[in-house]
Amino acid sequence: MDTIKKLAKSGEKRPILLSFTTDPYQHFDEINQLTRRAIEILLENNLKISILTKGGRRSERDFDLLSDHPNLSEYGTTLVFTNEKMRAQIEPNAAPTKERIKSLKKAYNLGIYTYVSLEPVWNPLESLALIKMTHKFVNFYKVGKLNYNDRQNSINWKIFKNEVITILSELGKDYYIKKDLQKY
């Protein structure tokens, strides 16, 4: 709690990330209750938060807090697959892609700033399709590549990067190309 108060007093503007190392919305209600309490404490101290989850509907329980603080809240989800069989194999504990997309749309409609993390890219065509499926209710895209997998060598990352930039630019979307993909 002391750290939170110090951050609040310092005028910190960068968002506190929930979470890039473990999902804040898991299948355990105790964790989800802790996540909600953490959000409440951070918002009570006027600290900006950015949520990244694969939790889908599980995350919607906190949309009331986020929508009450639209200037302090960002909600994002990781999207990798349009193919549900691949999604279930690679992301077995994550919510289905369609569910995550519905949660994104709901957040956006509540006035919450939304973003998508498109990574790792297993199939460039699926990633491009995900942009086309979500662009009407996503404010920002972060795009990375597949790393630490032999499959990465079979993808022409330069072509993919250029296609992503073209599509997002044509749609008028803000985006960030991660360093691992920028070099192509």
Q: Model regions: which residues?
A:
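C-terminal accessory regions of radical SAM enzymes
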Residues: T166-Y184
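Conserved AdoMet/S-adenosylmethionine-binding subsite of the radical SAM
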Residues: D2-L168
